[in-house]
């Protein structure tokens, strides 16, 4: 390969479309804005959801639900992520954070049953799914709700 044989990657050098530069360019005269109207004028700034003065959809529909300020948000950990630990390890939220499996604890850690557990572990967490609980005890490990 020589310097003069180098070519840019396909599609990486797309030419900017210059509008309003003659009719034969394909984007002359109206510059791709169509004919007259609000959107053809300069400085147009229609906010998202604006329907030309008609009551917009988000105001025609009723409000629903609420945000529960007391809802607990758990950090989720799957069984397959626990395989990084040695047999007989006591897995706590602090240990999970040190191992880089979780970033922050939030309201606690919830262990879910996705994946397959191959080690015998003692897992301490705020919550366990039924499948995770069954998988941990099936491998001879134990769970503890903290």
Swiss-Prot record:
The keyword Isomerase does not apply. Residues 1-13 have a biased composition (Basic and acidic residues). One of its GO terms (biological process) is translation. GO terms for cellular component: cytosolic large ribosomal subunit. It comes from the Bacteria. Keywords: Ribonucleoprotein, Ribosomal protein, RNA-binding, rRNA-binding. Residues 23-35 have a biased composition (Gly residues). Belongs to the universal ribosomal protein uL15 family. Binds to the 23S rRNA. Part of the 50S ribosomal subunit. This is Large ribosomal subunit protein uL15. The gene is rplO.
